[in-house]
Every structure is written in C-alpha cells, then in structure tokens.
Amino acid sequence: MFTLLPYQQRALDAVQTNTKGCVYVPTGGGKTVIMMEDAKQRIARASKPLTFVIVAPRILLANQLCGEFEEYLDNKDIHYMHCHSGETHHFKSTNPELIKLFATTAKVGGEHCFIFTTYNSIHKVNDSKVDVDVVYFDEAHHCVKKNNFVGIAQTSADANNSYFFTATPKYHGGVESMNNTSVYGNNIISIPAQELIDAGSIIPPKVVSYESQDTRSRENAAWVDGKNVVGILRGITDTDAPKVLVASPSSKCIWEMFTETDVLFQLKDMGYTIMHITSKHGAYIDKTKVSREVFFEKMSEFGADPDKKFIVFHYSILSEGMNVHGLTHCIMLRNLPVIEMAQTVGRVIRMHRDDRKAIADGKMKAGEFAFYKKPCGHVVIPTNNNYGDRIIKQLQNVVDTIFVKGEVPIA
C-alpha cells in the first residue's frame, strides 16, 4: 500500500476540504501523486460514475500523466480518453460531440471517465457540455495566458471541484492572474522546498559555471554551443553514466549544432545516446525519428538504467512536468524566465532511486548527502567575458528563493 509523505497528506487534506483552490508544491514533490490519490479516494467513495478532467500544458505531459494515473488507479472500471491533436493508444477526439458520447457511454455503463487534455484544447471539453466532477490543472501557471484563460475560467466555473497545481504561480494585474480567487479559489496550501529535502523527496541544486574559451556570437552560436556541451561533458567526474538535459536557445540552434558541427560524432564517440525534441522537428533518438510516446518511453528506460549515458536536447518542451528519471546534470545554454528557470532546475533535483530506497529501508537518513549516490543536481552555465554571468546571478537568486528562503517563486 502506498503511503503519502506528511506534506502530501496535508495537501490531500486541503484538496478534500475545499471545492476549489491552488496547491503550491515545489517541483519533485509529487503533485501528481496527490491528484491520483484524491481521485482514487473519490472513486472509492462514489455512489455514481465520476468524470475527471486532467489538463496539461503539453501533449507529451498529458500522455505521461495518463500513464501514471492508469498505473496508480489500476481499475478496470475506468475509461480513458484524450482531447488533443497528439498521438496516443487511447481513444482521442477534439470533436465535442464525440467527447460527450464517450463520457456518456462510460457513465451509462456505470464506469468512471478520465479525459486528458491540454490548455490549447480544454475549450473542446467545455463545448461538449460534459458534466465534470473534478478537474486538475497541472502546471497551472499556464492558465494565465490570455488564450488559455477563457477556457479554464469556464471549466473552473462548470466543474464541481477545481484544483490548480503548480510549483511556480504567476501573479499580475489582470483578471487572468492566479490571485483571482473567483476563478482559482484561494491558495489552500503551499509547501516549502526544505520540507521536501528533509523528507527525502528531492535534493538541493548546485549552480556551476563553465568557463568557455570562446566568445559566443550569432554567427558562431552553433559551433560555440556544441563545443561547450562537449567540454562540460568531458569535465563530469562525479558519475560514470551522466544523464544530461540541455536547455537550448532555439530549435534552429539545435539543428545547426547537429548539421554544421561534429558534435554528434563527438557525443557518440563518448558513448552517449543522443536524443532531441522540438515542436518544429519532432522527436529523434540517434538520428532516427520516433513518436513522442516512444521518445518518452525511452527516456524513462534510459533514466532507470544505471549504466546508460544519454543526453537530451530540447527547446522549451521538457522544462516542466516531464518526469525524466535519473537526470544528473542540466546544461543551460540560454537565459530563461523565472518560472521556466525554476522548472528547469526541477528536472535535476529528483532523488536517485537507490537513495530513495535506502532512506525508505532505514539504511540512511534523509539529508545525509555525504552518503547519497546523487547528493545534488548540477545546473551548468557556460560563461565567457561576462557572457552568462547575468544568467548565473538570476539562477542563483531563484535557487536561493526556493531552497534557502523557502518561498514560492512568483512571476
């Protein structure tokens, strides 16, 4: 039987005693587990079939969430569907009439319905007029985008229960702001990052500068970025099987790095499996184009393999929500907004599975980093002649806000 950590139980209690509200939990704290356990308990108490909607910012994350819910709930009396334009082995449609038909068929059959969708497609669920019992908004800071807000405001108003989960809330002066309680409800709980570290859920990040030998310009960006990535990888000595995420400046930079330099040859020579994903070019593993589902499955497989070396290049796709197991390092080749910066840090502060198990088995205590296989998550930034210094300063400020002051980073 799965046991929630104390802070997760408090968050679950907050959800179950409020019909609407914001749940702020740092990245790596298991927000999805809180959603899934809430759904599981509601189903166990239900006297009639329930309809759940789970909203994610990206198709890849919607698919990941669906897989996690399926495994966690392990219930044959549940029908799963997707409402987005991406790939899935489940039934999918953005046609409101078909969405309504699917949900109604499940209900008539006495079974529960889960609809996984994106912020871009939530209006299709609204148009279907499906009676929604519970909606979970994942990475809910995306709600404040003007083209998302109308849809989520309607969903929040129509659903019986609405919950907004994020590590990085976004406040501003407009009606879309997450402090608009008529749409988002109140902040029903906020968990400090130190509590997650003390519980053995995450590890602290370590900001590292890499002194580049070359001055980066628009003309030589691909060449310098590629050289810096290789140099950083050659300098990794704390693990024999680095698992590295690269936050790239643009899809164009990734493509030029691969087609105009020898970086692919060097990475293969170093024993790395090379993965990259962008909205423009799709997903690739070692020059072979694959579906997003296969890409995600392989990321999970490689992350769980203690001997596997791999590197993932992305542009603004894997920064948030994606559960890439085992990442040891992140190379930040571009400046990022505060929210995306905090989310990127979150990719590398997940606990090593062996460390998590050792703590659970009582072989060591949470926070005894000297005994951890993975005592910290490295975030590396290339610098040269003041280039990169501002990024490091901003990143360190974000890290201090979250991990030293214990505050929620609000943009």
Whereabouts are the PLM-identified features?
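Walker A/P-loop
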Residues: N18-D38
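N-terminal pre-P-loop "Q-motif" helix
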Residues: M1-T19
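Conserved helix-turn-beta segment of the N-terminal RecA-like "Helicase ATP-binding" lobe
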Residues: L60-N95
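Conserved RecA-like P-loop NTPase helicase motor core
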Residues: H142, H281-P409
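Conserved interdomain linker/interface between the two RecA-like ATPase lobes of SF2 helicase motors
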Residues: N186-E260
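Conserved RecA-like ASCE ATPase "motif II neighborhood" in helicase/translocase motors
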Residues: F102-I152, H314-S316
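Conserved Walker A/P-loop ATP-binding site and its immediately adjacent core
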Residues: V33-E37, K48-E71, P249-W255
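Post-DEXD/H (motif II) to motif III coupling segment of the RecA-like Helicase ATP-binding lobe
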Residues: H142-I202
